């Protein structure tokens, strides 16, 4: 049976990724360039899914002035492209990794989405997204997109495709959660902001996740960084800890986890197997300079080393 996924990235970026032992503020810092990638959270998810053999369609907005890198990537990977091109330039995000694994993001501004652009996207996307088994909506809102309009679009999307996977932050996260998507993947800090309080223990995190579920969200996955991830759904609560590995870059690790979650859910795997797979895919991303699953044997070995336990 053919399984199809669409990913929506409203605010993609070219990721300029580099390494420096330590950032010294106010000084000239020498940086080793490790890559320049056409990226964005949903695009990273699409790359992982394509590597795992899933048919993927991507959509969102692209800036007219520097779209070539994205168009080339979609063609090269064989990913169906439904992006809407708007006036302006897609932004550049600089991501610097230090020797201790700390990542500093410098996210520049990009194109502005007009009211007409948004109306066209909203109408067009809702006309074709209903054909997919799952839709992944990821990332931030570009300039010009009203959070309330985004909530309305997400709510309308639910009537066309109930299985929405949502991964965002800040105002986009708050707006999207109002539409009660099927699965959400905040990190611990984002969950604290939503809850309006610190969550110092894992039990606190679990309780906040259940509060989200009470709003109609079926699956809540909380990224804990190097500590792994928690998954809370109607069947139970699990915590997965990734195997130790050399950290090359943490850029795209969260998106890789989302790709693994979607794949496991599409294949109707158990929650335990799916979380183990997603944690392994994220660990693979950390050990390389770009996202993707290039070696299924390596993935299987990584899965075997994931420590997964019921939380209670």
Mark where each language-model region is:
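Conserved N-terminal subdomain of the carbohydrate kinase-like
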Residues: 27, 51-133, 301-312
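Glycine-rich phosphate/adenosyl-contacting loop at the front of the ribokinase-like
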Residues: 1-59, 67-69, 312
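Conserved phosphate/ATP/ADP-binding segment of small-molecule kinases
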Residues: 147-237
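Conserved phosphate-binding/catalytic region of the ribokinase-like
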Residues: 174, 202-312
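Short beta-strands and strand-loop turn motifs
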Residues: 105-107, 132-140, 167, 185-190
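Gly/Ala-rich phosphate-binding loop of Rossmann-like dinucleotide-binding domains
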Residues: 50, 158, 266
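Short, conserved phosphate/pyrophosphate- and ester-handling motifs at nucleotide-, phospho-/glycolipid
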Residues: 49, 187, 254
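Hydrophobic anchor at the start of a short beta-strand
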Residues: 5, 54-56, 81, 164, ...
């Amino acid at each position: 049976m053919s399984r199809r996924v669409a990913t929506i990235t409203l605010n993609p970026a070219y990721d300029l990724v580099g390494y420096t032992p330590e950032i010294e503020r106010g000084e000239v810092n020498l940086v080793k360039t490790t890559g320049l990638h056409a990226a964005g959270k949903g695009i990273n998810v699409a790359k992982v899914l394509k590597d795992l053999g899933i048919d993927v369609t991507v959509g969102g907005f692209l800036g007219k002035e520097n779209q070539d890198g994205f168009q080339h990537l979609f063609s090269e990977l064989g990913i169906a492209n439904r992006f809407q091109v708007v006036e302006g330039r897609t932004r550049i995000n600089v991501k610097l990794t230090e020797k201790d694994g700390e990542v500093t993001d410098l996210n520049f501004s990009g194109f502005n989405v007009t009211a007409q652009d948004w109306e066209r996207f909203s109408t067009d996307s809702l006309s074709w997204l209903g054909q997919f088994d799952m839709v992944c909506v990821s990332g931030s809102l570009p300039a010009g997109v009203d959070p309330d309009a985004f909530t309305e679009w997400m709510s309308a999307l639910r009537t066309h495709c109930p299985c929405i996977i949502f991964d965002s932050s800040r105002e986009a996260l708050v707006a999207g959660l109002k539409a009660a998507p099927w699965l959400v993947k905040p990190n611990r800090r984002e969950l604290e902001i939503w809850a309006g309080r610190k969550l110092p223990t894992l039990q606190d995190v679990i309780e906040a996740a259940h509060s989200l579920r009470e709003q109609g969200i079926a699956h809540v996955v909380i990224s804990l960084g190097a500590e792994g991830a928690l998954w809370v759904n109607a069947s139970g609560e699990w915590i997965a800890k990734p195997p130790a590995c050399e950290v090359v870059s943490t850029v795209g690790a969260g998106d890789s986890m989302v790709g693994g979650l979607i794949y496991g859910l599409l294949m109707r795997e158990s929650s335990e197997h799916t979380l183990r797979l997603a944690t392994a895919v994220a660990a693979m991303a950390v050990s390389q300079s770009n996202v993707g699953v290039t070696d299924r044997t390596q993935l299987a070995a990584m899965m075997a080393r994931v420590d997964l336990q019921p939380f209670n």
